[in-house]
């Protein structure tokens, strides 16, 4: 797959569909069953929970950046708009997920989240990097590029 395409799983039949990035706004349909495909990862961060974490993060066809956050956390609020911007910039190449650690303690405990924000970088179903704290945007972009190229 080249960087001008992404893969979207069909919610009906689970078939994996290769979609050109420049056609994501055309409401693509599944090639197998014809069902409408969900919006591609990357338009905006997706909320994940204890129940959906493995499916959304570890089963993703794209690398995933997970923002472990809480609503009362100042640095978490500061990095939120940066992650929204990066979600648009890396659309179709990187999925950005947000895990509210207050509402999802099981997943937070599983990954040893003790400070927030904590960013988890997952690629090919494996945790490949972790960042504790809210890095500046340029440092975060460098880290994302390293993960994408690895």
What are these regions (language model features)?
Residues 98:
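Conserved residues in the N-terminal Rossmann fold of short-chain dehydrogenase/reductase
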């Amino acid at each position: 797959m080249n960087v001008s395409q992404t893969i979207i799983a069909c919610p009906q039949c689970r078939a994996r569909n290769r979609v050109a990035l420049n056609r994501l706004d055309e409401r693509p349909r599944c090639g197998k069953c014809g069902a409408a495909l969900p919006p591609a990862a990357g338009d905006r961060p997706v909320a994940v929970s204890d129940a959906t974490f493995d499916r959304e993060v570890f089963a993703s066809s794209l690398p995933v950046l997970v923002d472990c956050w809480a609503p009362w956390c100042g640095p978490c609020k500061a990095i939120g708009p940066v992650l929204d911007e990066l979600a648009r910039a890396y659309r179709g190449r990187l999925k950005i997920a947000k895990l509210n650690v207050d509402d999802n303690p099981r997943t937070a405990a599983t990954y040893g989240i003790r400070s927030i924000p904590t960013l988890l970088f997952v690629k090919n179903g494996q945790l490949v990097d972790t960042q504790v704290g809210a890095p500046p945007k340029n440092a975060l972009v460098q880290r994302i590029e390293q993960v994408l190229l690895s």
